[in-house]
Amino acid sequence: MALSWLEGRGSFLISGPVGTGKTHLAIAAARATGKQFLFFPVVEVLDAMRPGGDELITPARLAAVSVLVLDDLGAEKPTDWTADRLYSIINRRWLEYRPTIITTNLLLGGTSSSNPAYLMGAVGERLYSRLADGSIGLRLSGADRRRA
């Protein structure tokens, strides 16, 4: 049941403060699927899409993999260009019913696309709608385990 989001086009959205185990949980969830997966920090994906970027990280490859893990959504500088690139990746996966696991320090939910503390405020209403469709959200809490 915990991996039921795999059956649809949904995402597994993991949010929480720094150091609460979001990345660790995301990779464990991807491995638990038993399917091929790719893991990339969002900033690296965006850097790779710029001219002269890493040719191994292509939109086609990100769209085709069974499960994609995008780490630290919202850490990128929000521009129209980054919003367009992220939307193209998420939308293509959504259209092809491919699950995506996403980690973020931002809060899930919210009803305003103008509050940057919420994921919707950081990525915009259009992208957030795709992420929310059929998704499971999980908010982690606690102290930064790397500082303990």
Language model segments and positions:
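Pre-Walker A adenine-sensing motif
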Residues: 1-7
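Short basic/glycine-enriched coil/helix segment immediately N-terminal to the Walker B
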Residues: 57-66
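Structured helix-beta-strand junction loops
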Residues: 8-9, 64-65, 96, 134
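Residue-level preference for the first positions of well-ordered beta-strands
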Residues: 11-13, 36-37, 67, 99-101
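Short secondary-structure capping micro-motifs at structural edges
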Residues: 25-30, 52-58
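Walker A/P-loop nucleotide-binding motif
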Residues: 8-26
